[in-house]
Amino acid sequence: MIINFKNHFLIAMPGLKDPLFKNSVIYMCKHDNNGAMGIIINKKIKNLTIQKILHQLKINIKSSNTLDFKNPVIIGGPILEDRGFILHTFKKKFTTSTHISNDLSITTSRDILEYIANLNNPKNILMALGHCIWKQHQLEQEIAKNIWLTTPADIDIIFNTPISEKWKKSMYSIGIMNILQLTSEIGHA
């Protein structure tokens, strides 16, 4: 039986050396017998904001909109790095929305950007370019090799925690207060 990690965080173990995944937190959008898909939520793209994306797409922002459009766009992963993925808590259905949980959806269509730009007070938006994928059983093998820790996702960490604190706060959420005590060695009883 496969454990389903959809709507969970993957938290990189401290020993992970790959610069993209080092100290990363990945929100898992999909996980089934065919593989898995997730979005890194704590690696920002330098000098790219939601405002710049909207400007490039010629989408005007309503003047009364209170969203901080200077929020950074996130590096979602190494696959399809030119494609946008928006995690959000809107109940509205967009052209390409997928509900991941009762509270959270992911959308890849332009209509969500137009919707966000015209709201008065949009909240709970994380925009990423790219995503991560794992082929069949690859994620389970990586977890067994102690590359990732897992925990149910926390919306507060996704949307309200500063980017630089998401990895540490995710570790704290599973009771790991002293990260230096972790080892990537696998124990055997």
Swiss-Prot record:
Species, as recorded: Buchnera aphidicola subsp. Baizongia pistaciae (strain Bp)
This protein's GO CC annotations: cytosol
Family matches, as NCBIfam families: PRK00228.1-1 (NF001266)
UniProt similarity note: Belongs to the UPF0301 (AlgH) family.
Name under which the protein is recorded: UPF0301 protein bbp_491
Highest taxon in the source lineage: Bacteria
